[in-house]
């Protein structure tokens, strides 16, 4: 297992840095990418945004994020909490591997 950390992708605004990340294609389902603030998905559910989300969900690694100030908190307020690796998380959708890591939780 390997953990990589980035920040501030602001939804589709800065997704290109992940698309250009050569190492990302060589990772496995045991690896994690943590976005430390301003993940920014979902925002408006546009066709372009949905394509970006689908691309991120198709990656071999698991995308996780800690929220920043550029999040759709109204969306996340509607998502159920789930226990995951010892801490509370929320998934982007019921079937999405993308998880919001709840502030103040400790993950194993």
Q: Where do the PLM segments sit?
A:
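Extreme N-terminal starter segment of soluble prokaryotic enzymes
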Residues: 1-4
């Amino acid at each position: 297992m390997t953990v990589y950390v980035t920040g501030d992708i602001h939804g589709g605004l800065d997704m290109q840095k992940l698309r250009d990340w050569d190492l990302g294609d060589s990772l496995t389902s045991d690896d994690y990418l943590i976005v430390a603030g301003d993940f920014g998905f979902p925002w408006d559910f546009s066709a372009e945004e949905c394509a970006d989300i689908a691309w991120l969900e198709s990656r071999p690694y698991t995308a996780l994020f800690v929220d920043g100030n550029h999040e759709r908190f109204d969306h996340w307020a509607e998502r159920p909490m789930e226990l995951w690796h010892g801490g509370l998380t929320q998934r982007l959708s019921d079937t999405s591997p993308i998880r919001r890591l709840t502030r103040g939780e400790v993950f194993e």
